[in-house]
Regions:
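A membrane-interface helix-boundary motif in multi-pass transporters
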Residues: 160-173, 365-389
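Helix-breaking motifs and short loop linkers at transmembrane-helix boundaries and internal kinks
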Residues: 76, 97-102, 114, 248, ...
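C-terminal transmembrane helical hairpin of 12-TM major facilitator-type secondary transporters
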Residues: 283-326
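Helix-to-loop junctions at the C-terminal end of transmembrane segments
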Residues: 64-76, 268-282
Length: 416
């Protein structure tokens, strides 16, 4: 049982951890390409090695998410969370003193693996929250995700202007502070009687995804997560290049637009989600969010003026509710002893989408880059994302209708 003091500290710790996790990623976005450039002799080599590091981070995150989730089911959430922050601190601080490309690749592998511990943070929230309150709590985490996404690139750009390695020093220091805070304050959320033995089969990313798909009613939702995650990461891959080519935006405009995405996430998931859940169930909210996101991606692709990109960002409020709603449904489908494995598999699936997105989005944009900026086909990556969101919508609606039909049939049998 979590002590009152520990219970009060638990959710703020996880929220702070999420902010730091996103800030640590955002801090290095403006400076990592330039840091890689210090070790390469040409722009082509710089682009290649930056791609290698992006792939290494995503691959390590994909492989580590189910392992850390299964470890947390066996040994508790607290030690795995603290291990993750320790590893993150080491990887960031090691970057400060890196003197060769292979060292940068190595620390990105470690960083990707250790940042997979945020799936354990989701499991921690599921442990301490009743099922009917999880969507709101996951929404709060989403708001912290957005806040970190606002602060990270801004702070990273300012620090990087002083020294390219200074953002890594700042990120490592934040991770160390969170490690110390968690060590002295954070209680364990998973009692011994709810733990289960660690098995490598459960920690295998492919097996964990298969196990996730076997949860009652979850298989279509796995496809929903894959589609929405891939669309999101394709957007992140193409946004800057797309807006630069189509509207002539520079770093300032792109920085403000990405900050706007984070602001919407904070407003919706931190302030509005709780109110929305009073009116709509997580399933209904997920459907409304997918409708909104489908339209938003299509409008981003068709936008003819830069201000339209901002207008759609702020119009797509419901789109920011999808992840929290679906995570809540997945969490409710898993039993109390499998939260870490289930949510670790969700994290691993998102990491896999992050690996695939550059290989899909960049070639799509390159294929239409010869067209004049006013040509509607320039928005091809965003139209692709709209199709992904529409597919997710069809899958979700079909699954929720089947659930209602089963409940109706069960109610009919019970009334006889």
């Amino acid at each position: 049982m979590i002590l009152r003091k520990g219970r009060a500290a638990a959710m703020p710790f996880i929220m702070l951890a999420t902010v730091i996790d996103m800030m640590s990623i955002g801090l290095i976005i403006p400076v990592l390409p330039a840091l890689v450039g210090e070790f390469t002799g040409s722009q082509a080599d710089q682009a290649f090695w930056y791609g290698v590091m992006t792939f290494a981070f995503g691959l390590a995150n994909f492989l580590a998410s189910p392992i850390l989730g299964a470890l947390s089911d066996a040994h508790g959430r607290r030690p795995v969370l603290l291990l993750g922050f320790c590893g993150m601190a080491v990887s960031f601080l090691a970057t400060v003193v890196a003197t060769a490309l292979w060292m940068l690749v190595a620390v990105r592998l470690v960083s990707g693996a250790m940042q997979a511990n945020m799936s354990v943070g989701n499991a921690y929230v599921a442990d301490i929250t009743p099922p009917d309150g999880r969507a709101k709590r996951f929404g709060m985490l989403g708001a912290m995700f957005g806040l970190g996404f606002i602060l990270g690139p801004v702070v990273g750009g300012l620090l990087g202007a002083i020294d390219l390695r200074l953002p890594f020093l700042a990120a490592g220091s934040l991770a160390l502070l969170n490690l110390l805070y968690g060590y002295f304050v954070l209680p364990e959320s998973l009692p011994a009687e709810r733990r289960r033995a660690f098995h490598w089969k459960a920690a295998n990313p492919v097996s964990s995804l298969r196990g996730l798909a076997q949860l009652k009613g979850a298989r279509p939702l796995v496809a929903v997560i894959a589609c929405t995650g891939l669309a999101q990461f394709v957007l992140y891959t193409c946004w800057v290049l797309y807006t630069t080519f189509k509207f002539g935006w520079g770093p300032l405009e792109n920085g403000w637009s990405l900050a706007a995405v984070g602001i919407v996430s904070v407003i919706v998931q931190g302030l509005l989600l709780g109110r929305l859940l009073r009116w709509f169930s997580p399933r209904r909210l997920a459907v409304l969010g997918l409708v909104s996101s489908t339209l938003a991606y299509a409008m981003w692709g068709a936008a003819s003026q830069g201000w339209m990109m901002f207008a759609v960002i702020f119009a797509n409020l419901l789109g920011a509710t999808v992840a929290a709603s679906v995570h809540s449904i997945i969490s409710s489908a898993a039993d109390a002893r499998s939260q870490g494995q289930a949510l670790g598999a969700v994290g691993g699936l998102n990491s896999l989408m992050a690996v695939l997105a550059p290989a899909i989005g960049a070639p799509l944009l390159a294929a239409v880059s010869h067209l004049p900026p006013g040509d509607w086909r320039i928005g091809a990556p965003f139209y692709f994302c709209a199709v992904l969101q529409a597919a997710a919508l069809v899958l979700a609606v079909g699954q929720f209708r089947r659930e209602r039909a089963r409940r109706g049939a069960a109610g009919g049998r019970n009334s006889k």
